[in-house]
Amino acid sequence: MGSSLSLCYPSDKTFNINGVKYTVNRILGEGGFSFVYLVKDNSNSKKYALKVMICQTQESINTAKREINAFQTFNHENIMKLIDHSISNHSQDTKEYRLLLPYYKDGTLQDLIDNQRTIYGKDTKKPLFKEKKCLQFFLKVCEAIQVFHNHSPPLAHRDIKPGNIVLQNLRRPSNNNNNNNNNNNNNNNNNNNNNNNNNNNNNNNNNNNNNNNNNNNNNNNSEDSDIEAIPILMDFGSVREARIKIENRKDALSLQDEVEQNTTPFYRAPELFDIPSDCQIDERIDVWALGCLLYTMAYNNSPFEVCDNEPNGSVALKVLSGLPKPFPPSQTNYSNQFNQLIIDMVNLDKDERLHLNQVIERINQIIQS
């Protein structure tokens, strides 16, 4: 705890990264052993996000190295770029990793969802996107993840969630009365790569026993429910080789500990909750998380969120019980194809779960239909 407190620098703190000086404006977010600051280049006042990681253990050093390596390995329009980085000795036994990243003023997808719930109520049935826009946005996220899965060896992101997707060029329709003051200027979470959005006060599990969403009014074809933005994937400290063979209890417990520290329960695949001593884990853990993400984009909550007063372990019980049905009501009549895509991604049986290339193919088919 002490090291984290010492990392919370004042607003006039100056960092030197490879000879360039940056001054802290404010903190954007924090999580684990890192803080993210809004900084400006002293030479031209350009704004950036600076992620500072204080590493006191070999494990945290390895996490920082993995994140830097992922930034340097992948080049895709929907994957965040690393502008610069430096490493310094914070103290005798502690290294400080500094990652200079683009600053996205529109915040994260989670900010957008939270804003929607703030305006319309936490149980709102008003979606952020109509179906086509939702799938177009989601397709770009899938294509970014596909870069990881196509790597040799295949890699898994392992922490796909709305808080790890920042928004570029966010556009809200001009006739939306609510697009000003609440317009994601809670960007305090901008590049808060590893912020634990698992507690995102979203704690309403919308699995009402209402009829399928298709029995709702389709009055939301109105323009005010449609937004546009470019998703940018971030937070690569959780990236690991996707295909892991678990051969004994020691392997299982080691992986269990790792995923509990580096993944978000609401988006965690069922095979990662109670890992058997003889099993194979692969990149379809990301497909599960993506299915939960698509559900959240459509229905404003992860399908597996729990309330504050629910006991520990409730998330695991919900996940292991499978996707709640029927789907909650919505002001948008999402098609049966759309909902079936979610069902096929959030499949308890990983061997029956879609692969990402199949997901992308299905998305394109639905968009074109």
UniProtKB/Swiss-Prot annotation:
Residues 175-221 have a biased composition (Low complexity). The active site is at D159. Residues 169-225 are annotated as: Disordered. It holds the Pfam family Pkinase. GO terms for cellular component: cytoplasm; Golgi apparatus. One of its GO terms (molecular function) is protein serine/threonine kinase activity. Its EC number is 2.7.11.1. InterPro entries: Kinase-like_dom_sf, Prot_kinase_dom, Protein_kinase_ATP_BS, Ser/Thr-specific_kinases, Ser/Thr_kinase_AS. It comes from the Eukaryota. Keywords: ATP-binding, Kinase, Nucleotide-binding, Serine/threonine-protein kinase, Transferase. It catalyses: L-seryl-[protein] + ATP = O-phospho-L-seryl-[protein] + ADP + H(+); L-threonyl-[protein] + ATP = O-phospho-L-threonyl-[protein] + ADP + H(+). Residues 22-367 form the Protein kinase domain. It is an enzyme of class 2 (transferase). ATP binds at L28, G29, E30, G31, G32, F33, S34, F35, V36, K51. Belongs to the protein kinase superfamily. Ser/Thr protein kinase family. This is Probable serine/threonine-protein kinase DDB_G0291350. It comes from Dictyostelium discoideum.
